[in-house]
UniProtKB/Swiss-Prot annotation:
UniProt xrefs under PANTHER family: ALKANESULFONATE MONOOXYGENASE-RELATED, CONSERVED PROTEIN
Origin: domain of life: Bacteria
Transmembrane portions of the chain: none
Record GO terms (molecular function): oxidoreductase activity, acting on paired donors, with incorporation or reduction of molecular oxygen
SUPFAM superfamilies linked: Bacterial luciferase-like
Protein family membership: To M.tuberculosis Rv2161c and Rv3079c.
Signal peptide bounds: none
Record-given protein name: Uncharacterized protein Mb0978c
Length: 282
């Protein structure tokens, strides 16, 4: 089982490049960043943790672009994986997004993982022309179309939301298969979607007790005829040795901790303390 760090990037505090370099130097496997293109002032969508239209803090309206952030991180690191937790592909043109991700994987020598979400902020999605009730189908088509562009010499796709004829698109990713993980609640509906269209699950802050959901996902994964086991990235706040040992036995592949978006010195102090605690859990 590995450990990763997620930075809620914003226009203040430590930069993504400095944060990724810090994470790599302390042995973390993956560096994650989130995505919000904008936050409509007038909204009806409830935030998953507040239960209403209020936001936990103002970082949501200050979020940096994830692919630019990971590109900067790529330039100053050599080993750590670069990922999103989570990106919102349906808010972009799929052909252009496929190019951005393939370019990042090419320049980072195959270090990209893509964490995606269906999008809790449906008001944000609507501004991008996304019908909220169709966002799952739209995301599935986007992923299928992008995989075609990443893997086929002459790619094409004919769906409800994505259509393009035979096309050339290079560079191809260094990885033969870029991992796609879905950040969503641990429900049967979501797990069936993951088993069909993704490679694993990122838990949410509300998924505190994950023992039963992990087993459910693994059962659905096997029933769908998928090989091996799904990747499972579990969010955590404080490392507890017994809990981490149990998660490893369950099949959790990576535990993800949040990095404070404060000054570089404050972030470094936090990462050093966390790395020391995790070393005691080995």
């Amino acid at each position: 089982m590995h450990y990763g760090l997620v930075l809620f990037t914003s226009d203040r505090g430590i930069t993504p490049a400095a944060a990724a370099r810090l994470a790599e130097s302390h042995g973390f496997r993956t560096f994650y960043v989130p995505e919000h293109t904008h936050i409509p002032v007038k909204r009806q969508a409830a935030h998953p943790t507040t239960g209403d239209a209020s936001l936990p803090d103002d970082r949501y309206m200050r979020t940096l672009d994830p692919w630019v952030s990971l590109g900067a991180a790529s330039a100053v690191t050599s080993r750590i994986r670069l990922a999103t937790a989570v990106a919102l592909p349906v808010e972009h043109d799929p052909i252009t997004l496929a190019k951005s991700i393939a370019t990042l994987d090419h320049l980072s020598h195959g270090r990209v993982s893509v964490g995606v979400g269906f999008g809790w902020n449906t008001d944000e999605l609507v501004d991008h022309g996304v019908p909220p009730g169709r966002r799952r189908t739209m995301l599935r088509e986007y992923l299928e179309a992008m995989r075609a562009l990443w893997t086929q010499e002459e790619a094409c796709y004919d769906g409800e939301f994505v259509k393009f004829g035979p096309s050339w698109a290079w560079p191809k990713p260094v990885q033969p298969h870029i991992p796609v993980l879905v950040g969503a609640a641990g429900t049967e509906k979501n797990f069936k979607w993951i088993a069909r269209s993704a490679d694993g699950w990122i838990t949410t802050p509300r998924d505190v007790d994950i023992d039963e959901p992990v087993k459910l996902l693994q059962d659905i994964w096997a029933a769908a005829g998928r090989d091996g086991l799904p990747q499972i990235v579990a969010l955590d706040v404080k490392p507890v040795p017994d809990k981490l040992a149990r998660w490893a036995e369950l099949g959790v592949t990576e535990v993800l901790f949040g990095m404070p978006d404060r000054s570089a010195d404050d972030a470094a102090a936090y990462v050093e303390r966390l790395a020391a605690k995790l070393a005691c859990c080995v």
